[in-house]
Amino acid sequence: MLPPDGKEELTVFRRNMLGLPENPEDAGEFDLVVVGGGIAGCCTALSAARLGCKVALIQNRPVLGGNNSSEVRVGLSGLIAQQPYPNLGNLVDELGPVGHWNNWEAKRDSSSVRSRQIMKILHQYPEKTIHNAGPASNYEDEKKFALLQNQENLNLFLNTQVVDVKKNGNKIVSVIGKNIISGKEYIFKAQLFSDCTGDGEVGFLAGADYRMGRESKEETGEPRAPLTSDLLVMGTSVQWYAEDTRNVSDF
């Protein structure tokens, strides 16, 4: 048997072969649906839930954290707890693991309570100073999951890829998510939607204007902008980590 290769035909074929319903299952109605479970999405969902909103956080991977998860292994960067907004970043600090940049911060102000806590952790676990491509434990996937899983008003949907949006005029009223393991589809309804996918996936599906690449110097006046616009974007790194186990192991 040769399966079809057209998108719509293949979708129907898969649905029939898996015995899935034709219409998506109702996942509920929310005040806010956050799509994307990286650091931005996690912080957005946590903040809204703590302010009393009923929130759904949809993440297409089995772990949270995005780049700052054990799947990708990019360390958190950026200064927080700085004047004139010393509380800006508290949620990131609560959610994220202690790492390289925390060490740098702590050395700048070694007398503060926060700095002493950071130095104590890094003294006990020196491997945490490895910024990128460190051991899986550096990225504390379990900490992120526990924080969001146990948050009141927050509903977590892992392994779910948003594949479509429904609109009323120019307003998004629902998104369709597909479980990447079972193939089953769900519909999420809400008053507000936050696109934290990192690639603007929800905006694209909704038909929003978008642009890729670099603007020209004539448009922006930026001294380092190219003379003409182009399609260059930031690169992506594939992080990896290896250790000598002194035993033969399967890859």
Where are these regions (language model features)?
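Conserved N-terminal/central alpha/beta ligand/cofactor-binding core
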Residues: 2-11, 21, 27, 47, ...
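Beta1/beta-strand and adjacent pyrophosphate-binding region of the FAD-binding site
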Residues: 24-38
